[in-house]
Regions:
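Domain-level signal for soluble alpha/beta catalytic cores
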Residues: 1-281
Length: 281
């Protein structure tokens, strides 16, 4: 991992705007996976892959042109930073009703305006309905190939790739199968471990996306006392650390946030309570 020794290196969280062509590919895939009998052939598989590869090449080139040192693929192939795992792991199906954060619940007028503006995501959030295991490594292999090819062409200082934490997958995709939430988290960690290790083995920095450690407070664990949230968040970190046990610390970084949505955020867990937990990762 490059360090800011001579100057402050520039980077970002990972997800970048998609073109309409990319959006069309992602939602065509979404429709096909939701209903195998649906006519979701807006793009043939080869064409869709070519669209994504071209988008990755362009977004990496653009980042380098703008002076970004540590670039990403913009998550071009992912419809969501957390639900993308349903394409790669077994055990997910259906959809999950949206539940706004506690801060928005207390401002129903704002919540209604956000809904009217189309701020609510339209993609599915599958639920865990069966055993979690690796299903298909093809999407990850394609992501790694596309990013490495783009990096060879644009020559940034370094590149990173996003991967969801076990906790954030559990936050957006509830458990209907495992006996306990802890069993679910453990299964997710075991299945995601190979993705984490493959990214690092490809010579790319791994970024763990873990908003569950902050946003989880006013969403999944909204009804829990703060002390109980801290205990649960600590368990999320233990599970994550186990999944990362073979990854050198200098090859991984972590993204934690309270949710990138327009809202009052008055239920955000305070940094002074959060930081001691996060530093255990």
């Amino acid at each position: 991992m490059h360090r800011s020794t001579d100057r402050i290196l520039t980077t970002h969280v990972g997800s970048l705007p998609r073109s309409q062509a990319v959006v069309d590919v992602l939602f065509a895939r979404e429709r096909a996976e939701a209903d195998a009998s649906a006519n979701a052939s807006v793009h043939a598989p080869g064409e869709g892959e070519a669209v994504i590869a071209a988008a990755v090449a362009e977004v990496v080139r653009r980042q380098v042109t703008l002076g970004i040192d540590v670039v990403s693929d913009g998550e071009m192939s992912k419809i969501s930073y957390a639900t993308y795992v349903a394409r790669r792991l077994t055990g997910f199906a259906g959809d999950t009703p949206r539940e706004p954060g506690q801060d928005l619940v207390e401002f129903p007028g704002l919540l209604r305006k956000l809904a009217e503006r189309g701020s609510t995501a339209k993609y599915r959030r599958p639920r865990c309905v069966g055993p979690i295991a690796v299903k298909d490594t093809g999407p990850l292999e394609a992501d790694l190939h596309n990013l490495r090819a783009a990096v060879r062409e644009a020559a940034p200082a370094e590149a990173f790739m996003n991967a969801a934490s076990p906790g954030v997958v559990a936050l957006f995709q509830p458990n209907d199968f495992y006996r306990t939430q802890d069993d679910y988290l453990t299964a997710l960690a075991g299945a995601l471990q190979s993705e984490y290790e493959a990214i690092v083995a490809a010579g790319i920095l791994l970024q763990i996306d873990a908003p569950d450690l902050a946003m989880g407070r006013h969403t999944m664990y909204r009804n829990q006392p703060l002390e109980e949230f801290e205990r649960l968040a600590a368990r999320h970190i233990e599970v994550l650390n186990h999944a990362l046990r073979n990854v050198p610390g200098e090859r991984v970084r972590m993204h934690v946030c309270w949710g990138n949505y327009e809202g009052p955020h008055h239920h955000d867990v305070p940094m002074e309570r959060l930081l001691p937990l996060v530093l255990r990762a």
